Amino acid sequence: MFAAKVLVVDDSPTMRQFIVFALQRLPGLQIDEAGDGVAALKQLSSEKYDLLLTDINMPMMDGLKLVGLVRNDVGYKKLPIIVVTTEGSNVTRERALGIGANEYLTKPLQTAKLIAVVRNLLDPERRRD
């Protein structure tokens, strides 16, 4: 694994803690956290990230709106995005992927699956322009 910066966005401190703990198994990751989409946008505007992992249902700004705004930002058009949510419907999944998410994972999260998806999205061979 190589050095990469990840932003984890979820309004649940417990879920953020779980995700951060799981991702710490991957060497070289620097992990930042945000509690909602508005806070995430502020961090994205001041820091360069290699991966965004976001919940959907959050106050202030939901994850789908966040994904759409990030995809419209020239600096982040190719940023890998994982949506993590309790919403398991195909409609929500298709909507998230349609607006630009690369992956859609449902809660409760399986640590091994999360790590595999993150590894795959951060693979330098996949990220070449």
Predicted features along the sequence, with ranges:
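C-terminal output helix
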Residues: 109-118
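Receiver (REC) domain active-site loop signature in two-component systems and cognate sites
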Residues: 58
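Conserved acidic segment of CheY-like receiver
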Residues: 3-14, 19-23, 52
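His-Asp phosphorelay/catalytic-motif detector in bacterial-type signaling
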Residues: 48-50, 75-80
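Acidic, metal-coordinating helix/loop segments flanking the phosphotransfer/catalytic sites
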Residues: 33-51, 94
